[in-house]
UniProtKB/Swiss-Prot annotation:
Self-association state and partner proteins as the record states: Part of the 30S ribosomal subunit. Interacts with proteins S7 and S18. Binds to IF-3.
Gene3D superfamilies per the UniProt record, alphabetical: Ribosomal protein S11
Protein name: Small ribosomal subunit protein uS11
SUPFAM superfamilies with a match to the protein in the record: Translational machinery components
Pfam family, one: Ribosomal_S11
Domain of life: Bacteria
GO biological process: translation
Function noted in UniProt: Located on the platform of the 30S subunit, it bridges several disparate RNA helices of the 16S rRNA. Forms part of the Shine-Dalgarno cleft in the 70S ribosome.
Native source species: Microcystis aeruginosa (strain NIES-843 / IAM M-2473)
Annotated PANTHER family: 40S RIBOSOMAL PROTEIN S14/30S RIBOSOMAL PROTEIN S11 (PTHR11759)
UniProt KW keywords: Ribonucleoprotein, Ribosomal protein, RNA-binding, rRNA-binding
Amino acid sequence: MARPTKKTGPKKQKKNIPTGVAHIQSTFNNTIVTIADTKGDVISWASAGSSGFKGAKKGTPFAAQTAADNAARRAIEQGMRQLEVMVSGPGAGRETAIRALQGAGLEITLIRDVTPIPHNGCRPPKRRRV
């Protein structure tokens, strides 16, 4: 019979990272907030789906606010105080997520829109007929 392995303490140790970058990817269906340090190593992340929303509710501004709040709380536990924010996508939760990061106690130094815009690249999908 296999012996149970012993668990050795918490796997994630607390770091002291004062500045970082928050990437907010906001689509029509979901909002994903990822907070990384200046090197690019991810410190915390949250999405509307991981925050407990399902289906069409994931695309709402309130779901984006909850996701940003969860990610910010975990980043503050790691010692984060200042953020640069990179916003990507056309979703409804863009501004709400930025406001939630500010409301959680993080100081935002820069907001940049990094939504990829094609210079007439790939053909878009056909229009929906409802």
